Amino acid sequence: MRRIVCPPVLFLSASLLTGCDFSGIFASIQSEVPLKIPSIRGVVTGLVKCNNKLYACAGQLWEKDASKSEGKWTAVNFLPGKKITSIVSKGACVYACVSGEGVYTYTSNGAGRTGGTTTPSTVLGKTNGAIRIGGSDNPFLQMPCELSSGSSGGGGGGSGSSSDGGIKNGSDENVLGSGTGYVVTTKAVYTKSNSSGTSCTYTKDGTFTATTSPILGCTSDGKGCFYVLDGTDVHCRTVQASGGGNGAHCAVASGSATSCKVAHTVTNPLCIAHVKNGQTEFLLIGGSQGYKEIKLETGSGSGTGCLKAENVRGPEQWGEDSVTPKDRVSQYEGTIGRFAISDIYTVESTSGAGGTNGGTNKPDVYVVVGDSQDGYTGLWRFDAQKKEWNRE
């Protein structure tokens, strides 16, 4: 059995990266938007914003000034010789996991300054043997399989105490995401079952059933709704943060079951992300060839959070409010639309970065691309100011 815990010092979840073989030819688009030489090569498995800098991990830690629309990523002199597999941020700190070893801390000096501080240089307490970290507001730490039938695996590489709370789950079950009162894994949705004390105790939610197995991803709108991705559908749910026992019920005020899930129509779906693009909110579903979007119903009515089939849109249906506007669809189709997108990240714009729409900021969107020839594998960004996709 694995144990997934949430000790007070940490904050977690994770995105699963799927390796796929894909090919494409970019020559036809080079004349329209010259492609940059990538400053990060390889598979990016995490991206966070910390102290007005961006940090990515692709085996090692990379950083970039988030306040500038241009600029290259530079490698951070942090944990040389070790392979960082996942990261989260909190305040001015980046927490980096070396799978099977534990979690280390890197303190960012902030935008306009180079370097940082490794604090401490040893594995953080209660993280020995950690496999993965992830998430934001209520992240989780995933620990390895138990070493014996008598150990809980909580917070100590198989030798911790069950008083840490968390989830006891199978060795083939991985955390995909978490938020206030819930955790989503590849097999189930778990909801908080104990509203007292500081421990994080969760139980499998019997009110939620995925259409297909395994569950592939989850994302949150930051306002109480979270969305679960499986092979055919996206499910909209909400949960009481205090763990009132109602489970992850339908997030739509009307309670209509047909409003709580929709077929995403994405071939070989791999990831899901929530994007607030100006005044419009979307779910982006990455798959084996680019992504599709689901426009969310927003407002104060009974349809808030509602998922509708008519709002599932491919490139031919994108509008000016889309992440990739309709007049940039050809550039999308000539670049990332040809390849697998295995992860999607959004970064709120700061001074000098991002675009605007009537005074409302639009975020930059980063995607992880997979190419069978490896020539275009890596991190790409939609620059909301320039309105174009390009390599990072």
Curated annotation (Swiss-Prot):
Membrane topology: Lipid-anchor
Transmembrane segments: none
Residue numbers with lipid attached (N-palmitoyl cysteine): C20
Segments for region (Disordered): 148-173
Domain of life, per lineage: Bacteria
Residues lipid-modified (S-diacylglycerol cysteine): C20
Protein name, entry field: Uncharacterized lipoprotein TP_0462/TP_0463
Source species: Treponema pallidum (strain Nichols)
